[in-house]
Amino acid sequence: MAKRCEVCGKGVVSGVQYSHSHRQSKRRWAPNIKSVRAVVNGVPKKVSVCTRCLRSGKVQRAI
């Protein structure tokens, strides 16, 4: 599954995680992406959307 929102473009962010002893390890933070059926140009289509776009109403779900 894609790790990028098709509505807002939110994607994976990389960075460094620090342990308690301050040792570093590289890691990735992935957005909460859901695969939903949404109406795109009047046609129901399966799209990958982040949960923030779903909650804010930027996506019209197909029933």
UniProtKB/Swiss-Prot annotation:
Keyword set, alphabetical order: Ribonucleoprotein, Ribosomal protein
CC annotations in GO: ribonucleoprotein complex; ribosome
Pfam family membership, one: Ribosomal_L28
GO molecular function, a single term: structural constituent of ribosome
One of the GO BP terms on file: translation
InterPro entries given in the database record: Bacterial_rp_bL28 (IPR050096), Ribosomal_bL28 (IPR026569), Ribosomal_bL28/bL31-like_sf (IPR034704), Ribosomal_bL28_bact-type (IPR001383), Ribosomal_bL28_sf (IPR037147)
Protein family per UniProt: Belongs to the bacterial ribosomal protein bL28 family.
Name of the protein described by the UniProt record: Large ribosomal subunit protein bL28
Organism: Clostridium novyi (strain NT)
